[in-house]
Amino acid sequence: MKKTVIALLAWFVSSASLAATPWQKITHPVPGAAQSIGSFANGCIIGADTLPVQSDNYQVMRTDQRRYFGHPDLVMFIQRLSHQAQQRRLGTVLIGDMGMPAGGRFNGGHASHQTGLDVDIFLQLPKTRWSQAQLLRPQALDLVSRDGKHVVPSRWSSDIASLIKLAAQDNDVTRIFVNPAIKQQLCLDAGSDRDWLRKVRPWFQHRAHMHVRLRCPADSLECEDQPLPPPGDGCGAELQSWFEPPKPGTTKPEKKTPPPLPPSCQALLDEHVL
């Protein structure tokens, strides 16, 4: 277990030691009407909002990394979700990475989070608010068994399931990425109310947090949405395929060269950095 916690902690802090990208040199949001530009994994944002770090309903982790910027829709979603969680007495919502002041590529840890429409939220709901020291060096709680086949019963709770369900039922949310074992547990617990499960997508890692993604805002004309998830609750053969051993001869895909930036994002970099 100790090794797992260390590995998760290393994942969250590893980016601090890597070389900065040009986007990290932009220290304040670019003025203008809020516009998410490009795709979630290749884009930027004009007119980002800052998530207030002081709130009765949530706490922001790793504020020293300055990754608490996003489209106004994302800020309002976080405030809305955390308020709903408090109304239901679930606990304090712990907010992880959103995006940088102008979005763009991180130096590590994330391929997406570039257009101000993504946020990581810990799957912990502390009843006692964390100290500043805890927030700066958060201890991720691994909810998944060592073999990756199920959640750890002593760490799973109906409150965590309720938080994920609340997020999935939000009209602005298009996808929520969690570990396959977490998705599997949600499928088992859901009962007859299953429509929201369509948005909850199994993905690698995500053992201690959920990655919430919003749809492109209607007035962000250069924003590229993903196709909708397949119909259904996603609890059948597709989910089970994540638990099958790799086929013989399967190799990890090679790292791809990042595609060219959308012209508007390149122009933003040219004006503010290069």
From Swiss-Prot:
- Is this entry keyworded Cell inner membrane? no
EC number annotated for this UniProt entry: 3.4.24.-
How many cofactors are bound and how?
Answer: Binds 2 Zn(2+) ions per subunit. Zn(2+) ion 1 is bound in the active site. Zn(2+) ion 2 is bound at the dimer interface by residues from both subunits.
Which cysteines bridge via disulfide bonds? C44-C265, C187-C235, C216-C223
Single Gene Ontology BP annotation:
peptidoglycan metabolic process
* Segment forming the signal sequence: 1-19
Task: Please state where this protein is localized.
Answer: Periplasm
Q: Name one GO molecular function term.
A: metal ion binding
Q: Which family does it belong to?
A: Belongs to the peptidase M74 family.
Q: What does this protein do?
A: Murein endopeptidase that cleaves the D-alanyl-meso-2,6-diamino-pimelyl amide bond that connects peptidoglycan strands. Likely plays a role in the removal of murein from the sacculus.
Protein name in UniProt: Penicillin-insensitive murein endopeptidase
As recorded in Swiss-Prot or TrEMBL, the protein's gene is named mepA
